[in-house]
Amino acid sequence: GATLRITRLRPSGRGADVWDELHPTAAQQVQLYDWLVARGDGILTGDSFFHLSGLGQPGALAGLNLCGAGRVVCLIDPVGDVYACPFAIHDRFLAGNILADSGFQNVWQNSKLFRELREPQSAGACGSCDHYDGCRGGCMAAKFFTGLPLDGPDPECVQGYGEPALALERDKPKPSGDHSRSGGRKGPIPLKLLKLPPKKFCNESPV
């Protein structure tokens, strides 16, 4: 049968404008956790919901139990910039550029940022929490874009440590620039249209 992949709403990109209004309540987090555990491997979550692992037994929730940024995942944007995470598009998490830095392999293996992310991380403010081994402090991008310290609790910490941190005065980072780099070509971009009939109808038709 089919599987479903769901992704956590993070306060980055366009999500930054709606996160305060739309992110799940504590009760909804529990409901989501129970739903994910009940469906097991039929739901693909990647590392999106490891911050919920403190609600149950270790290993009950499918997927990684740590932030995969720079370890198992990264993002390459249309101009070749490599970021540690698809949800962390900011100069703070820019590892390099595949065009300027001798290709992706060099960036992935030798970037200073990626090497730092792969080192053992300090538990910081979460060091005294019994559930730290389960969630590893939560999502790096969620913390950064809500103005919380990277060694602090996830803003949606299921043990309740995120809410007091969010109540403090915070400096939310702004986008570090226009990553579209649209200042080059002016005018329309010519497209190459297919003049020969497609080999299969489904190659052209969305239905």
Question: Where do the protein language model's features map onto the residues?
Answer:
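Flexible mid-to-C-terminal extensions adjoining Fe-S/redox cofactors in radical SAM and related proteins
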Residues: 87-207
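Radical SAM enzyme [4Fe-4S]-AdoMet core and its adjacent flexible, acidic
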Residues: 1-82, 87-96
